[in-house]
Amino acid sequence: MIRETGEFVINLTTEELAFATDYCGVKSGRDVDKFKETGLTREKAEKVKAPMIAEAPVSIECKVKEIRELGSHHMFIAQVAAVHADEKYMDEKNRFDLNRARPIVYSHGEYLGTGKKLGTFGYSVKKAKKQAKKR
């Protein structure tokens, strides 16, 4: 489908959407209406014809620039046409809050939560604070 249209949308998925995400990855849209079966809401994209998922915290509209055949699958190299982020996942500094969104990753057949904050940029090279001398 992406090869024919040259467009797609990446919808960030979350712990809450994991079951629907798995269903959409297993079932073909040629056989079932994935939106109807999962209860997800189809949302019109601004720059591409592929739909966005309204429940996704982030949707990235993409236009294919190159397709590389890699044996059993294809890799799509695309240009980002638009990015949409749900306001409820933005913090007070207008940054996307991963802890609030609780995104998941897929690795080797398993869905995993992203877990806790491990550090901030530069924490590996920061000098330890000196303790005040006791009197």
Model-predicted regions and their roles:
Residues 1-135:
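Basic, polyanion-binding surface patches
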